Structures are given as structure tokens and as C-alpha cells.
């Protein structure tokens, strides 16, 4: 594509947009492979008895992904989006090999460090590149489709892996599927995906003339998205709590259901139901937030997640109630997930977007670290139901924080992540 033909918009960039949607489905599938089986493998194959030890792989994954998000946000403007996307998929190739050869749980933890880097680079770049392509008018819709594809991939992979693990050796299923996904995605990115630098330049020149044209430094973007700007800090804490909930669903829920007598197949279905609802729902919630604003959906979604977790805590492992809780958690997350990134993107200019989104995604994915540590230690102390109930209370408080701290889109003018008066 030549510079003279560069345009912003979903229709104008339909082919590349669709390709990035497909790539993100593979990103989601890569992590979805572990959803229904890896905690059980920790107990059955490696003899882990402590929930905190089992959840160590989630802590490693979350820490690696969080730090990679932070680096990716800064490197995107320097190295290019496409290049980071390709590197992200190259890093995924050792994951199935480490799982296949693992003589101890330490190797599984190491594999999840590589998986976290893969997710941080590949998912971050598909998010930013879609925003680059469509421009500001369809931002929520673009993010909804992106997250729908990613978590649709998570759901399908989780359900299929749970079913296949009931018929075959669980570790073999992870290895074969993981290598196939990584290899296909890497080839697609190398051969067909194009960079979006020209689209960024077009939006910056068209909609943000007179603002700074260089990306902010991390030392400026980090405090903005962490505490300095009300809208950004509200989104960052909500993202962290949202992924704390996801860590709970990933690591604690399979163990909770297994302790109540659920089979691997039943656990796989419930583990897949939550991200399936989450994934499909985002097709509409992202676009809905373009119409009514970001704040109502974020607040409602956090409160619904809190209610769903409370139901799961009270279910005592009854599959019908657990399934209903999984649906509620999926709907609540669908309301929140794409809308938070859209709210972040509303508040900054195109050149500041990768760094600011990277900081947000750092805090959001630190939820896996906090969730893995907190839920693991708490589950060892007060059992699974009490742990889930405590997290439900934290989610309620997070939703109330957003209600107080996040302004409506009409009240919030787009701003630089770093004020123009500062030197770059």
C-alpha cells in the first residue's frame, strides 16, 4: 500500500483488519490450551498439593506479560508494530517444547514465562494495530472484535483441550496443539501482515495537528496511567481487578470444581463457557460503548462480575450454579474488557497511545500476578469458597471506584499522556 492510498476506517482496511482478527484468535487459543488442564496436570503429574504452588505458573505468566506490555508500548514506535508481532510469535515456539520435555514443574513455570512474552507482544500489537487502522470513530467496535476473537480463541481451545484431555494424555494435547498454533501464526504474520505506521501518521496529522508528534517517555507515561490522571488510574485499577478475577477463573475454579467431584470434561466445559460469553459479547459491547460512552459499561460490568463470583462461592460446586456464574462472569467481563482500552485510547493522542496502553496493560496483567499469589495463599488458608467470596468483594469495590473516579466521555477531552510543555 502506498502512502497516497492510506485511509482510516474499517471498510477501507477490511482485509488487514480481518487478518489481525484471525491472528488474535490464535493468540487467545495459545493461552486457552492451558485453561482447563494445566492446574490439574500440576496436581496429577507433578504431585503438587499446595494451591499456591500450582498457581505459580499464572504468577510467572502474568509477570512476564505485564513487563512485556510495558516494553512493547515503548518499542512499538521505535521498532514498529509488525516487527514486534513477529517476535512475539517466534517467542511462542519454545512453549510446547518446554511442556513436552518438562521433568519438573519448574519447566512448566518457565514455559509460561515465554507464553507471557508471546501474549504481551502479540496481543498488544494486534490491539494497537487495529486502533491504528480504524481511526477514532469505530475504536470501541474495533476493540470489541479484537477481544472477541482473542477470547473466542481462549474459549474454543479451553473446551477442546478439556475434551481431548479426557480421551488422550493431557500434556500431549497441549504440546501438539501449541506448536501448530505458534507455527501457523508466525507464518501468517511474516507473509501477510503489514505495518500501520502510515495510518498513525495520517491520524496524527488530521486530528491532532499542533500536538507533539513524538511518543512520550515511559517515565512520563507511567505516572500518567498509574496515578496522575483520574481517568487513566481508574481504568488501570479496574483492569488489574478484572484480570485478578481471570486468574481466579483460570487457576482456582478448576481445582474448586474438581474438589467437588466434577470430571475433567465438565471442568473443561465450564472453563470454556466464561471466555466464550466474554468473547462473543465483546462484538456488541465495544460498539455499544461508542454510542453510550465507556463509564456505564465499565461500572455495570464490574458489579456484575462481583455478583457472579458471589454466586460461584455460594454454589458449593453445583454444576448448574457454577455454569450460571460462569455466564455472569463472562457477560460482566465483556462489558468491561474492550471498553477499558477504548477509554484509555480516548484520553490520549495517537503517538502517545502505544506507551499509555502499554502501561495500562502492564497494570491489567499484573492482576494475574496478584491473583495467582493472593488466591493461592488465601485458598491454602481458607479454602476455595472463601477465596472466591473475598475476590467478589474486591471486585465490588473496584466498580465503585470507577463510578467515582472515571468521568464520562463528554467531560473528558483527549489529552497527551505527556503534556506538550515537557521536553521529549
Regions found by a protein language model. Give the residues of each.
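Helix-loop boundary and gating motifs at the non-cytosolic
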Residues: 11-62, 231-234, 238, 242-260
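Residue-level signature of mid-helix packing/kink "hotspots" within the transmembrane helices
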Residues: 62-70, 155, 275-283, 368-369
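C-terminal transmembrane helical hairpin of 12-TM major facilitator-type secondary transporters
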Residues: 295-340
Amino acid at each position: 500500500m502506498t502512502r497516497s492510498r492510506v485511509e482510516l476506517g474499517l471498510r477501507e482496511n477490511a482485509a488487514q483488519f480481518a487478518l489481525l482478527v484471525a491472528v488474535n484468535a490464535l493468540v487467545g487459543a495459545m493461552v486457552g490450551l492451558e485453561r482447563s488442564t494445566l492446574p490439574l496436570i500440576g496436581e496429577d503429574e507433578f504431585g503438587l498439593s499446595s494451591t499456591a504452588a500450582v498457581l505459580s505458573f499464572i504468577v510467572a505468566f502474568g509477570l512476564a506479560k505485564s513487563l512485556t506490555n510495558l516494553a512493547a508500548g515503548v518499542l512499538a514506535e521505535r521498532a514498529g508494530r509488525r516487527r514486534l508481532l513477529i517476535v512475539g510469535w517466534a517467542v511462542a515456539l519454545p512453549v510446547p517444547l518446554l511442556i513436552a520435555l518438562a521433568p519438573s514443574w519448574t519447566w512448566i513455570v518457565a514455559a509460561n514465562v515465554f507464553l507471557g512474552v508471546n501474549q504481551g507482544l502479540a496481543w498488544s500489537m494486534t490491539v494497537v494495530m487495529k486502533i491504528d487502522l480504524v481511526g477514532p470513530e469505530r475504536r470501541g467496535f474495533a476493540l470489541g472484535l479484537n477481544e472477541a476473537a482473542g477470547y473466542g480463541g481462549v474459549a474454543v481451545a479451553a473446551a477442546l483441550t478439556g475434551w481431548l484431555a479426557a480421551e488422550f494424555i493431557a500434556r500431549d494435547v497441549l504440546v501438539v496443539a501449541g506448536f501448530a498454533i505458534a507455527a501457523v501464526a508466525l507464518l501468517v504474520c511474516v507473509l501477510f501482515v503489514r505495518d500501520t505506521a502510515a495510518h498513525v501518521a495520517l491520524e496524527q496529522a488530521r486530528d491532532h495537528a499542533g500536538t507533539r508528534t513524538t511518543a512520550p517517555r515511559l517515565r512520563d507515561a507511567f505516572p500518567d496511567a498509574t496515578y496522575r490522571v483520574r481517568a487513566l488510574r481508574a481504568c488501570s485499577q479496574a483492569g488489574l481487578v478484572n484480570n485478578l478475577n481471570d486468574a481466579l477463573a483460570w487457576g482456582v475454579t478448576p481445582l474448586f470444581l474438581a474438589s467437588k467431584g466434577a470430571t475433567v470434561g465438565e471442568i473443561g466445559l465450564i472453563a470454556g463457557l466464561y471466555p466464550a460469553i466474554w468473547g462473543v459479547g465483546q462484538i456488541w459491547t465495544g460498539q455499544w460503548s461508542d454510542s453510550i460512552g465507556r463509564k456505564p459499561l465499565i461500572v455495570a460490568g464490574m458489579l456484575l462480575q462481583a455478583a457472579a463470583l458471589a454466586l460461584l462461592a455460594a454454589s458449593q460446586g453445583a454444576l448448574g450454579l457454577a455454569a450460571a456464574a460462569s455466564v455472569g462472569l463472562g457477560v460482566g467481563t465483556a462489558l468491561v474488557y474492550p471498553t477499558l482500552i477504548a477509554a484509555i485510547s480516548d484520553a490520549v493522542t495517537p503517538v502517545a497511545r502505544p506507551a499509555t496502553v502499554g502501561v495500562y496493560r502492564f497494570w491489567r496483567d499484573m492482576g494475574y500476578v496478584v491473583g495467582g499469589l493472593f488466591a493461592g495463599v488465601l485458598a491454602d488458608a481458607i479454602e476455595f469458597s472463601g477465596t472466591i467470596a473475598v475476590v467478589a468483594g474486591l471486585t465490588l469495590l473496584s466498580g465503585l471506584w470507577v463510578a467515582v473516579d472515571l468521568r464520562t466521555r463528554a467531560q473528558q477531552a483527549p489529552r497527551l499522556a505527556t503534556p506538550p510543555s515537557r521536553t521529549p
